[in-house]
């Protein structure tokens, strides 16, 4: 009986849904537009003297969001690992309208760090109104061509747990203020772009986590999920941040050129949408059409990417920069490491994939039982000195 019911629904539900949506879409769009217009003019949250905690605030979208909240007169708590960059952002935020700004050097993938900076924010200001999670880490490599798998945990830790931990710690205080969580997601959570497999997986987990949490909170704490395509940020160049703050840049020698969009405009849209109480902020909106293709005609996406990526030759990935404590060139919008002591360290060995030995062997184990990934020694930022600038 169940099999018969499923067979009938498989035949009836898809076309029936498309017919209903065709008739309901204009009405739903009008309702959404009317609600947005009303909230814009009559129900926008006043951020004057409100407290906003922003992770990943040292650069890119986090930095621009800090400036937008500063223009609205908010009190800011800027969190990132690069303390020097936080000082620069703090000074500018003060100049353009922020009442008070404190900076805290911390690592969002460590629960103790998250508990520390949220607690210090509450001790200093007495409340938390908005938590903005922007810390993110992207990549532009083909999964099977990666030689160093130690980057895998970093991608998932920062893109997923780097949002979950601050949210978990901040929720009790957000309940007290009926506050809001702002999430930096991406269209890659449902658009399967090549060379972004782990990033897409992490963003998909992130969006599903917050959509579920939205129902659990039942409106007591708002959630705004910001999804974007390619924007002009460090991440659009494949930037990585290693655990100790060193950065590296992957360069795919056979990648499709992609130009970033206006980062400042997206930040302005995010803050405006959060203050209106929007569930989603999308930039650009036309990316939504790809979701329809994925649901109803997934082969179209596959053919499109196959056409875009088809070329002659062998795929090759090279590591442009990696290290610890090396100077960073910030003269351009996409930060690149300036390697000390010679040219970039590009392996001169033969291609990684050969006919032998087999890619997977029974021994030794791929992941050794020791040492643990996160050493027991004190983290890089063991002191969290609140500094008002």
UniProtKB/Swiss-Prot annotation:
<keyword id="KW-0735">Signal-anchor</keyword>
<dbReference type="GO" id="GO:0016491">
    <property type="term" value="F:oxidoreductase activity"/>
</dbReference>
<keyword id="KW-0560">Oxidoreductase</keyword>
<dbReference type="GO" id="GO:0016020">
    <property type="term" value="C:membrane"/>
</dbReference>
<feature type="binding site">
    <location>
        <position position="107"/>
    </location>
    <ligand>
        <name>NADP(+)</name>
    </ligand>
</feature>
<keyword id="KW-1133">Transmembrane helix</keyword>
<keyword id="KW-0443">Lipid metabolism</keyword>
<feature type="transmembrane region" description="Helical; Signal-anchor for type II membrane protein">
    <location>
        <begin position="11"/>
        <end position="31"/>
    </location>
</feature>
<dbReference type="InterPro" id="IPR020904">
    <property type="entry name" value="Sc_DH/Rdtase_CS"/>
</dbReference>
<feature type="region of interest" description="Disordered">
    <location>
        <begin position="337"/>
        <end position="381"/>
    </location>
</feature>
<dbReference type="GO" id="GO:0006694">
    <property type="term" value="P:steroid biosynthetic process"/>
</dbReference>
<comment type="similarity">
    <text>Belongs to the short-chain dehydrogenases/reductases (SDR) family.</text>
</comment>
<keyword id="KW-0444">Lipid biosynthesis</keyword>
<dbReference type="InterPro" id="IPR036291">
    <property type="entry name" value="NAD(P)-bd_dom_sf"/>
</dbReference>
<keyword id="KW-0521">NADP</keyword>
<dbReference type="InterPro" id="IPR002347">
    <property type="entry name" value="SDR_fam"/>
</dbReference>
<feature type="active site" description="Proton acceptor">
    <location>
        <position position="199"/>
    </location>
</feature>
<keyword id="KW-0752">Steroid biosynthesis</keyword>
<feature type="binding site">
    <location>
        <position position="203"/>
    </location>
    <ligand>
        <name>NADP(+)</name>
    </ligand>
</feature>
<feature type="binding site">
    <location>
        <position position="186"/>
    </location>
    <ligand>
        <name>substrate</name>
    </ligand>
</feature>
<feature type="compositionally biased region" description="Pro residues">
    <location>
        <begin position="365"/>
        <end position="378"/>
    </location>
</feature>
<protein>
    <recommendedName>
        <fullName>11-beta-hydroxysteroid dehydrogenase-like 5</fullName>
        <ecNumber>1.1.1.-</ecNumber>
    </recommendedName>
</protein>
<feature type="binding site">
    <location>
        <begin position="199"/>
        <end position="203"/>
    </location>
    <ligand>
        <name>NADP(+)</name>
    </ligand>
</feature>
<feature type="binding site">
    <location>
        <begin position="56"/>
        <end position="82"/>
    </location>
    <ligand>
        <name>NADP(+)</name>
    </ligand>
</feature>
<keyword id="KW-0472">Membrane</keyword>
<dbReference type="Pfam" id="PF00106">
    <property type="entry name" value="adh_short"/>
</dbReference>
<keyword id="KW-0812">Transmembrane</keyword>
């Amino acid at each position: 009986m169940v099999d018969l019911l499923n067979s009938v629904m498989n035949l009836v539900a898809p076309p029936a849904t498309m017919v209903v949506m065709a008739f309901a879409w204009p009405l739903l769009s009008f309702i959404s537009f009317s609600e947005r217009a009303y909230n814009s003019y009559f129900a926008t949250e006043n951020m004057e003297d409100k407290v906003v905690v922003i992770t990943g605030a040292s650069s890119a979208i986090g930095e621009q969001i800090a400036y937008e909240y500063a223009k609205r007169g908010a009190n800011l708590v800027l969190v990132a690992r690069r303390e020097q960059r936080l000082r620069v952002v703090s000074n500018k935020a003060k100049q353009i309208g922020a009442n008070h700004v404190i900076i805290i050097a911390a690592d969002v993938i460590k629960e103790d760090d998250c508990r520390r900076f949220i607690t210090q924010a509450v001790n200093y200001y007495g409340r938390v109104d908005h938590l903005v999670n922007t810390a993110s880490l992207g990549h532009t490599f083909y999964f099977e061509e990666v030689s160093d798998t130690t980057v895998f945990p970093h991608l998932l830790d920062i893109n997923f747990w780097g949002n979950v931990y601050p949210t978990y710690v901040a929720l009790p205080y957000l309940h007290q203020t009926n506050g809001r969580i702002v999430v930096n997601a991406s269209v890659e959570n449902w658009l399967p772009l090549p060379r972004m497999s782990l990033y897409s997986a992490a963003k998909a987990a992130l969006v599903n986590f917050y959509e579920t949490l939205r129902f659990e909170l039942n409106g007591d704490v708002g959630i705004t999920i910001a999804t974007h395509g390619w924007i002009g940020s460090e991440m659009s160049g494949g930037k990585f941040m290693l655990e100790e703050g060193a950065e590296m840049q992957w360069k795919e020698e056979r990648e499709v050129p992609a130009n970033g969009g206006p980062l400042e405009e997206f930040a302005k849209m995010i803050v405006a949408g959060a203050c209106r109480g929007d569930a989603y902020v999308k930039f650009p909106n036309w990316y939504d059409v790809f979701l329809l293709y994925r649901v109803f005609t997934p082969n179209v996406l596959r053919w499109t990417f196959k056409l875009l990526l088809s070329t002659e030759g062998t795929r090759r990935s090279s590591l442009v920069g990696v290290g610890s404590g090396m100077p960073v060139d910030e003269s351009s919008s996409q930060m690149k490491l300036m390697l000390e002591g010679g040219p970039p360290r590009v392996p001169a060995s033969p291609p990684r994939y050969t006919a032998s030995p087999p890619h997977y062997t029974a021994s030794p184990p791929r992941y050794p039982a020791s040492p643990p990934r996160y050493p027991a020694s004190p983290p890089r930022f063991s002191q969290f000195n609140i500094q008002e600038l």
